[in-house]
């Protein structure tokens, strides 16, 4: 079996915003269902701020790996790593043991920036809105990626905005 690949899972607005004040700047129930379906059973790697933003910790049914340089950070039911390399090694080993083909990096900005050059797949929700925020998804060169799946979702009950769910694979 080949080593589990690295996948980024993110939702961004048209202006690149992924967060504001430690939270998502929109309500997209349909996208949360896609997030759960995409990540369930797989290791998820996140930064400390993303961990702190989770309404329920840890994310159930997934190995939660948190990147933090704070020596006194000891969350219950999560693995803490100081480097992305360490987090990826632990996550890939866990994914292999469970027969999973990928590990998921779920944010925030700094973690996405570190992981993007190593990622082979992106699960990218593109929210049809320009919103205020203080966290952004890194610049993405679309020429490096091929879209393999696309789903359009209208705004509606539980979804503040229309969005497009895309799966991209590195060329």
For each feature predicted by the language model, list its residue ranges.
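Enzymes that bind and transform nitrogen-containing heteroaromatic metabolites
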Residues: 2-171
């Amino acid at each position: 079996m080949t080593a589990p690949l690295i996948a980024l899972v993110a939702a961004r607005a048209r202006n690149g915003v992924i967060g504001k004040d430690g939270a998502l700047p929109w309500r997209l129930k349909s996208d949360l269902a896609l997030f759960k379906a995409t990540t369930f059973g797989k290791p998820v790697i996140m930064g400390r701020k993303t961990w702190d933003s989770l309404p329920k910790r840890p994310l159930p049914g997934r190995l939660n790996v948190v990147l933090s340089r704070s020596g006194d950070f000891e969350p219950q039911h999560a693995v803490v790593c100081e480097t992305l390399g360490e987090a990826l090694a632990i996550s890939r080993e866990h994914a292999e043991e469970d027969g999973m083909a990928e590990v998921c990096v779920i944010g925030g900005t700094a973690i996405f920036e570190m992981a993007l050059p190593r990622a082979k797949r992106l699960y990218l929700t593109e929210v049809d809105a320009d919103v205020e925020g203080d966290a952004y998804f890194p610049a993405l060169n679309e020429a490096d990626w091929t879209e393999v799946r696309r789903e359009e979702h209208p705004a509606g009950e539980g979804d503040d905005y229309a969005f497009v769910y895309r799966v991209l694979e590195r060329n």
